[in-house]
């Protein structure tokens, strides 16, 4: 499984990274995201760590925004997208991880409505970004009543773990 973060600032802009993805040979707009690869780490803490590592940001308010399957026709990957608010730059910037993919991740703040327009024009195509951007726009339209607490149970992930549809042999990070 994996987590992603839609970071929202006080001007209702979302933070998106531009990351090169070799399988499609393109740079894609993406939210900060990562695998649930530290045994025992709560999913929202993984999301907070990824926000710090990839964007150099931290947030005071966290909610579950949306859960989805990335590509259920060929993968069991379940993704939980968190909404991070009260976002500020992390003192010291990004956390250095030594991971090559995180060395140069340019990011920018995009107004929610502009991000939705980019999705609908096909200019944002990463599935996590598409789902996250549309979900945050809908959550805002619903006056944030659709948000769930950060520690909301994730039964789909439990099901996948119990049925052996999730790899549990991922090398732990130290």
Q: What is the predicted function of each stretch?
A:
Residues 27, 64, 72-75, 99-174:
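Nudix hydrolase/Nudix homology domain
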Residues 3-49, 99-101, 157-166:
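Conserved Nudix-box catalytic region and its N-terminal flanking loop in Nudix hydrolases
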Residues 56-57, 124:
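Helix N-cap/coil-helix junction residues
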Residues 71-92:
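Active-site-adjacent beta-strand/loop module that shapes the phosphate/pyrophosphate-binding cleft
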Residues 7, 83-85, 109-111:
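Short, well-ordered beta-strand micro-motif
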Residues 58-65:
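A short coil-to-beta-strand element that immediately follows conserved catalytic motifs
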């Amino acid at each position: 499984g994996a987590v992603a973060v839609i970071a929202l600032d006080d001007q209702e802009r979302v933070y998106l990274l531009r990351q090169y993805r070799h399988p499609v040979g393109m740079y894609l707009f993406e939210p900060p995201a990562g695998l649930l690869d530290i045994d025992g780490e709560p999913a929202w803490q993984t999301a907070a760590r990824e926000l710090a590592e990839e964007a150099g940001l931290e947030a005071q308010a966290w909610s579950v925004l949306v859960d989805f399957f990335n590509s259920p026709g060929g993968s069991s990957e379940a993704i939980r997208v968190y909404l991070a608010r009260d976002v500020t730059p992390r003192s010291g910037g990004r956390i250095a991880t030594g991971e090559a993919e995180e060395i140069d991740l340019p990011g920018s703040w995009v107004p929610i409505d502009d991000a939705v327009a980019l999705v609908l024009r096909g200019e944002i195509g990463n599935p996590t970004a598409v789902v996250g951007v549309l979900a945050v726009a809908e959550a805002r339209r619903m006056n944030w009543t659709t948000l769930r607490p950060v520690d909301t149970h994730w039964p789909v992930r439990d099901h996948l773990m119990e049925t052996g549809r999730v790899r549990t042999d991922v090398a732990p990070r130290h």
